[in-house]
């Protein structure tokens, strides 16, 4: 946990609308995972390469990102680049994650454990059943809760919008209160 700032809450889609969330979270049992089970969230943009290459080098990353993923709309380019950068370097050990899967009808809530991981060397070890081979940027997570879409808490927490990675407008205290108090 970072001693210099309070934990944040992040939203992460793993694949389109969370379609690959199950592939990264079945190593220790069936999906959805039980509380206190380890798993992963992952994002794409494999064309930028291993983000460890860019640690403390945002300008070099941004330049290479614009080459790998050109877009005439500077706002779109910046938004996409910042999602990858935030996933790799702004998310810290101890931050929280909300990760919905429309396909599975479940929303997972967890806490990040550790730093950014690159899966470029052997992409079959973490999620052998994934169908998108470009999901190579990883973060390890300790799952705290799995909330089904028929639970009232699902609607309250499934507000991460359309971005793959986003900082959510909810405090960690409120998030923990929601998941520990059962259905609201």
Put a short name on every predicted segment.
Residues 1-51, 123-184:
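Contiguous surface segments at macromolecular interaction interfaces
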Residues 50, 54-139:
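Structured alpha/beta reader/binder surfaces that contact nucleic acids or chromatin modification marks
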């Amino acid at each position: 946990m970072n001693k210099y700032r309070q934990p944040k809450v992040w939203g992460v889609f793993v694949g389109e609308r969370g379609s690959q969330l199950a592939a990264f979270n079945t190593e220790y049992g069936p999906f959805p995972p039980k509380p206190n089970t380890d798993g992963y969230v992952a994002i794409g943009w494999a064309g930028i390469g291993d983000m460890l290459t860019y640690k403390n080098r945002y300008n070099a990353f941004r330049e290479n990102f614009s080459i790998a993923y050109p877009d005439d709309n500077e706002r779109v380019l910046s938004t996409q680049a910042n999602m990858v950068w935030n996933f790799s370097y702004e998310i810290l050990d101890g931050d929280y994650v909300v990760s919905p899967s429309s396909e599975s009808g479940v929303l997972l809530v967890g806490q990040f454990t550790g730093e950014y991981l690159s899966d470029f060397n052997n992409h079959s070890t973490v999620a052998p059943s994934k169908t998108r081979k470009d999901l190579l940027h990883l973060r390890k997570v300790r799952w705290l809760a799995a909330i089904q879409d028929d639970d009232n808490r699902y609607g309250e927490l499934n507000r991460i919008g359309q971005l793959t990675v986003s900082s959510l407008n909810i405090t960690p205290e409120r998030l923990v209160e929601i998941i520990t108090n059962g259905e609201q």
